[in-house]
Amino acid sequence: MNILDALDAQSKRTDLPDFRAGDTVKVHARVVEGNRSRVQIFQGVVIRRQGDGLRETFLVRKISFGVGVERTYPINSPAIDRIEVVTRGDVRRAKLYYLRELRGKKAKIKEKREKQPS
């Protein structure tokens, strides 16, 4: 392993949950306003995960007052306080860009059901 890989491994976050495209997540991001900071919660559907290592990002989409809002977050950003997975989505694609054109019930993602141990 070279020096850059070792630095990347040190900077990578391990406290984040496992999530993928289709999951509904709450992103608790620290926002600095002037001399004070607060935590802002952004809840929406993960549209994509992209990249690998320190440069990995994910895109979250929500509808706010009838307008679609999308935010891209770096996974290893220190500005992210924590990520909560609200629901697991059952989708067959890695990138859900088609949700941008859908409205109402058509934009709803089926919830993944956990298998019961027998």
From Swiss-Prot:
GO terms for molecular function: structural constituent of ribosome. Gene3D superfamilies: 2.30.30.790. Keywords: Ribonucleoprotein, Ribosomal protein. Pfam families: Ribosomal_L19 (PF01245). Belongs to the bacterial ribosomal protein bL19 family. This protein is located at the 30S-50S ribosomal subunit interface and may play a role in the structure and function of the aminoacyl-tRNA binding site. This is Large ribosomal subunit protein bL19.
